[in-house]
């Protein structure tokens, strides 16, 4: 029941190198996944080339998916690492019930001896619940998330994924831009192939006012996660920075992509509602607003237009939130 990974390098000409990779399963070598890419040589081996890093991440995701796809009942699992991977899949479903299931899985993984990653993802999970404004969150959510961050950092302070998750949590719950910058920089240095690390650094730069650099970093995160089953997350990360750097059409396209792959992910719906209104597409704005209201019962066009606490801050900073046009379809 083992998996076999094969990687082959080849030359197409003097300046180009290609990589082929495949994952086989069992004695028969049944194909699970295959991929290939090529890049230009510029002296040193192209280990940091975005296409090659992306191919490596796709291979890792394919292996992880193959190991979990046949599992139908998580209650039978006694492997902490496998439980953590299943929980991460549930987290990126982004539905309230899926996040609750993921939290239970991660708690069990901790009881089975999981590393700091389980604590970090439990903190990240609560961050998502907070931003998504889920109805089932408790008043102690921020404090619980902070304790989980402390636990994760004490146990594995040099784990790139732990640092990225803690960076995100510190930024959103504590508004600590400096901490997010430092943690995400170290996360990137420890693993430059980690898209969550680049995404965290992009978000830190965004809130630090370095918008153009934030967008470049978000583009990098999206590119190296190309083909990921969680692509909607990276698409929306780039949507944020596109909006803040005045790239309205790009932001709309990215939000549409994120919504297509995760219809119940609320932030793309919020941004599409506002961006369609600003682009003089009132019918589309109204349609997105109606979808959002089914997921977020206290949503209103008026609140989006005038409530500073409503979670679309980058749109307000960018000037792309046209309150008059948003309100034009209110009621």
Outline where the language-model segments fall.
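Structural signature of tandem alpha-helical TPR/SEL1-like repeats
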Residues: 98-104, 135-150, 173-186, 208-220, ...
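Short coil turns that delineate tetratricopeptide repeat
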Residues: 111-114, 154-157, 192, 226-229, ...
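Catalytic-center loop of serine/cysteine hydrolases
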Residues: 1-88, 92, 97
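Alpha-helical segment of the N-proximal tetratricopeptide repeat
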Residues: 79-112, 128, 132, 165
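Canonical positions in the second alpha-helix
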Residues: 108-109, 151-152, 186-187, 220-224, ...
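TPR alpha-solenoid repeat register
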Residues: 116-119, 162, 197, 231-234, ...
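"A position-specific structural signal for the A-helix of alpha-solenoid helical repeats
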Residues: 85-89, 121, 128, 165, ...
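Residue at a conserved register position within TPR or TPR-like alpha-solenoid repeats
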Residues: 90, 126, 170-171, 205, ...
């Amino acid at each position: 029941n083992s998996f076999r990974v094969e990687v082959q390098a080849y030359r197409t000409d003097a300046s180009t190198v290609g990589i082929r990779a495949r994952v086989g399963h069992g004695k028969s070598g049944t194909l699970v996944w295959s991929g290939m890419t090529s890049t230009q040589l510029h002296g040193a081996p192209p280990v940091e080339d975005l296409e090659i890093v992306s191919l490596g991440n796709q291979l890792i995701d394919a292996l992880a998916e193959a190991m979990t796809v046949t599992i139908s009942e998580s209650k039978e699992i006694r492997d902490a690492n496998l439980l953590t991977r299943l929980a991460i899949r549930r987290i990126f479903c982004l539905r309230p019930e899926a996040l609750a299931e993921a939290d239970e899985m991660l708690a069990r993984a901790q009881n089975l001896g999981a590393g700091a990653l389980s604590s970090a993802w439990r903190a990240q999970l609560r961050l998502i619940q907070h931003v998504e404004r889920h109805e089932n969150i408790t008043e102690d959510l921020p404090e619980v998330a902070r304790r989980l961050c402390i636990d994760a950092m004490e146990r594995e302070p040099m784990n790139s994924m732990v640092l990225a998750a803690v960076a995100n949590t510190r930024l959103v719950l504590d508004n600590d831009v400096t901490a997010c910058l430092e943690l995400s920089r170290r996360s990137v240095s420890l693993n430059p192939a980690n898209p969550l690390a680049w995404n965290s650094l992009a978000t830190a730069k965004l809130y630090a006012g370095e918008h153009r650099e934030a967008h470049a970093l978000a583009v990098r995160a999206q590119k190296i996660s190309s083909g990921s089953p969680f692509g909607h997350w990276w698409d929306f990360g780039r949507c944020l920075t596109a909006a803040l750097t005045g790239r309205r059409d790009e932001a709309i396209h990215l939000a549409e992509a994120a919504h297509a792959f995760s219809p119940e992910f609320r932030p793309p719906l919020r941004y599409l509602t506002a961006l369609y209104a600003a682009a003089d597409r009132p019918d589309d704005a109204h349609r997105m607003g109606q979808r959002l209201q089914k997921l977020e019962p206290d949503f209103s066009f008026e609140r989006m237009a005038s409530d500073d606490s409503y979670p679309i801050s980058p749109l307000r900073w960018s000037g792309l939130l046209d309150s008059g046009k948003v309100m034009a379809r209110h009621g």
